[in-house]
Amino acid sequence: MKLKYLVSAMALVVLSSGTAMAKTPDMGSFHADMGSCQSCHAKPIKVTDSETHENAQCKSCHGEYAELANDKLQFDPHNSHLGDINCTSCHKGHEEPKFYCNECHSFDIKPMPFSDAKKKKSWDDGWDQDKIQKAIAAGPSETTQVLVVGAGSAGFNASLAAKKAGANVILVDKAPFSGGNSMISAGGMNAVGTKQQTAHGVEDKVEWFIEDAMKGGRQQNDIKLVTILAEQSADGVQWLESLGANLDDLKRSGGARVDRTHRPHGGKSSGPEIIDTLRKAAKEQGIDTRLNSRVVKLVVNDDHSVVGAVVHGKHTGYYMIGAKSVVLATGGYGMNKEMIAYYRPTMKDMTSSNNITATGDGVLMAKEIGASMTDIDWVQAHPTVGKDSRILISETVRGVGAVMVNKDGNRFISELTTRDKASDAILKQPGQFAWIIFDNQLYKKAKMVRGYDHLEMLYKGDTVEQLAKSTGMKVADLAKTVSDYNGYVASGKDTAFGRADMPLNMTQSPYYAVKVAPGIHHTMGGVAINTTASVLDLQSKPIDGLFAAGEVTGGVHGYNRLGGNAIADTVVFGRIAGDNAAKHALDK
């Protein structure tokens, strides 16, 4: 029988009474007092970097997250969009716990149990160059055919593709949980020529996908990469579905001429659905996935071929993994303030919607060995990040019918324009913010909107007039905006701003609004790759043994990325990178 009474007590402590139950200085001591060190650790005690055994012990006593979920709590860490992550992501054995939710949110809650425990310096705070060089001099402590760095969508897809091609794979990530930026993606995956489009009667063409992406990127994209993205996008959706993902729903993202963004039915966010699917597939296929394992240096031989990497493990320290192929899938640098200030100084004070792991590690390591960069100084702002927060208000909300207005309640641009144009337009409005407004129809249709309500981000009014008063908008202006927009929906033509897709009117009470402003969302550039996802050197020649996919790369999206193309990028080029990395390794 699981310790459900203890679980309930601890859940209440987390969100109410602080450290009331903690009579010992830390969680490890608490469990030792109840039994022994072996209550958590294997005998003899040897903790892996992923803390796999310890997490299994947690669940053997306390139950899986589904059992721990408590719908009586306003915010339930055990039932969140992060999915089934490691217990030790937040609960620490012999040190102060860490409430990871507040890395993005600002929940006003009491301390977690054992929060009076000693706070230790982060295990990966800084890189010890002497130890890195010693690890290289000692040579590989183990070898694999393919080493994948970064366990987001690109990394998981690369690992699964390499495994399918017959290679042995090790997948590492510096975070205590997998997912990366993909885990917090809300929109979906763009694809052309899918069964979903056929079922919904949507006519689309590969040429249209390419044209839309190139136009959105201001013609600065590498058209060869965009063509591959378009041509292989439908197969990417089918691949995810074969692994168990649900992508039945369709909507239109900004810059697309038709509905081509595939997402889960019921209004769920796409990121958790895709990452949970990939996590399960990697586990089922026996891929060696290591968390708390930060790659700190790529290792090259005298011929300048990549032959492995130095890893800094939370418990194992610095060691080298020898690999015939390495895939970089480390994401962008949207959370690296120094890199943002250097490459895009005008955005250095902006908030970011990114996962805290998006610190540009892969870019820096690739530059160190002579990799070429492309579009590295282009950074995309998402127009609708919750004002004074890091919570992304998904483009899906506008895509399924919401309207954007300024502080007075007046529209100022088509809601489905590209992100760069929408961001620029918002920054030209009084106060440099906007309101996203919608009615109860959209509230019921888009599940993520109910999440914003749960986070107390929504303003509400039983009438349009009440909504205007609660937000400070001008009553007459907002009333006219809603009336005019409903007329456009009825006629099928937006004569004010030319919005092509208007799936919902605003006629059903109550009415809602959420305050938004632009925030750093996607770093457009990174390492240069070719059509096989090989990383290029300064002479535009492939670096032997090094591949890359996802936001760590540049060239796919040009100056500005369209919503839905990032997940497509991670799936399509993640698979290409993994497949070619495996072929390279197996041929050596």
UniProtKB/Swiss-Prot annotation:
FAD binds at residues 154, 173, 181-182, 187-188, 295, 361, 551, 564, 566-567. The active site is at 419 (proton donor). Induction: By anaerobic growth on Fe(3+) ions. Not expressed in cells cultured either anaerobically with other soluble respiratory substrates or microaerobically. SUPFAM superfamilies: FAD/NAD(P)-binding domain (SSF51905), Multiheme cytochromes (SSF48695), Succinate dehydrogenase/fumarate reductase flavoprotein, catalytic domain (SSF56425). InterPro entries: FAD-dep_OxRdtase_2_FAD-bd (IPR003953), FAD-oxidoreductase_2 (IPR050315), FAD/NAD-bd_sf (IPR036188), Flavocytochrome_c (IPR010960), Multihaem_cyt_sf (IPR036280), Succ_DH/fumarate_Rdtase_cat_sf (IPR027477), Tetrahaem_cytochrome (IPR012286). Heme c 4 binds at residues 81, 101, 104-105. GO terms for molecular function: FMN binding; metal ion binding; oxidoreductase activity. It is an enzyme of class 1 (oxidoreductase). Its main location: periplasm. Heme c 3 binds at residues 78, 87, 90-91. Residues 1-22 form the signal peptide. Its EC number is 1.3.2.-. Heme c 2 binds at residues 31, 58, 61-62, 218. Keywords: Electron transport, FAD, Flavoprotein, Heme, Iron, Metal-binding, Oxidoreductase, Periplasm, Signal, Transport. The keyword Flavoprotein applies. Heme c 1 binds at residues 37, 40-41, 93-94. Succinate binds at residues 187, 382, 394-395, 521, 561, 564. Flavocytochrome that catalyzes the reduction of fumarate to succinate in vitro. Is essentially unidirectional, catalyzing only fumarate reduction. In vitro, can use the artificial electron donor methyl viologen. May be involved in an alternative route for electron transport to Fe(3+). In the C-terminal section; belongs to the FAD-dependent oxidoreductase 2 family. FRD/SDH subfamily. This is Probable fumarate reductase Ifc3. It comes from Shewanella frigidimarina (strain NCIMB 400). The gene is ifcA.
